[in-house]
């Protein structure tokens, strides 16, 4: 397995190569094959550390740094063995026009534009097209309406041009930034910014006052759109600074159709746990990583007593289990191939089995982690196995030299077929 983790302490990226069963906290356990530093340019330090990274089309590692630097690094083809000095070379570094205090809050791919979108807490959103490796197009700036700071900006994966955002005392807004029939060709036009707009198509309404008739504070931290969207309107889920997850269907009004309190700390990450999107994984600012069902609800799970209102019973999204072992907040979360990959303040990269919640791999990386990227879930060949293969090859070559010419040719042909069969088996497995 191969992972990339951002280093908050130094601003670089660490590449971690390990197999199942790896555990650096135990001396007698399997150790990682490799843990190395990369992406040391441009002048990396804690001051310009990476906040978010993504794997762009298996070609680039794209990272947004504090201060507005968008760094694009090359992801080399795994089929070829490459020296470390040629790995993750810096291809281009964009300097986005933001203030030093303007924090990057999201980074993701926009396939229809062959671009990435970067959002900042000020409400500035930049669309960056790499123009077939030329990197000669200027980023396009779109300012989100509202005039308030935002803590989250997310795209609707099923409806082009639709995005959601929100923040502290800034409830969810769904906005249309471009038409659905747009293409990457707009970046070749003179006034490319004219192809973008900021049309608010939905504004959420706060939940009803609490049992004391007090207003419930608003602080959106995460938004995730469901893949299956209604014909009209939008369906999405939010997480809040106050430990709530809320499900919205805009066809049923501006308020959430479901409102659950799942923890007492700010929710930092919100990720769908399965293809059906019926389960979510959250992490909070303390040490919680938990999986909840969105369809199984414990109607009487939350019970509080009020002197004025008596017993107050609220439904809670059923807790399906917790992923334990971490200490401190978890910021980097990725789900895929039946695995959960995490990284955070306790300086460990962990890989969990989604079904059993058992630790599959645990690697101490020595740095605080803000973002995690998975490059490969497949098992890697260890150095010992490589050395063993080389020794076996040497013995085979030595044996061939002692054979007559005809037998040697037959042996070479047999080896060739064996190699082809091996590759075919590997392809089928993957």
Curated annotation (Swiss-Prot):
- Which one GO biological process term can you cite for this protein? ribosomal large subunit biogenesis
Q: Which GO terms describe its cellular component?
A: nucleolus; preribosome, large subunit precursor
Compartments annotated for it: namely: Nucleus, Nucleolus
Keywords (alphabetical) are: Nucleus, Ribosome biogenesis, rRNA processing
- The principal location of this protein is nucleus
Protein name listed in UniProt: Ribosome biogenesis protein NSA1
Q: Does the keyword Oxidoreductase apply?
A: no
Q: Which CDD domains match?
A: Nsa1 (cd22858)
The job of this chain, per UniProt, is described as: Involved in the biogenesis of the 60S ribosomal subunit.
Which protein family is named in the record? Belongs to the NSA1 family.
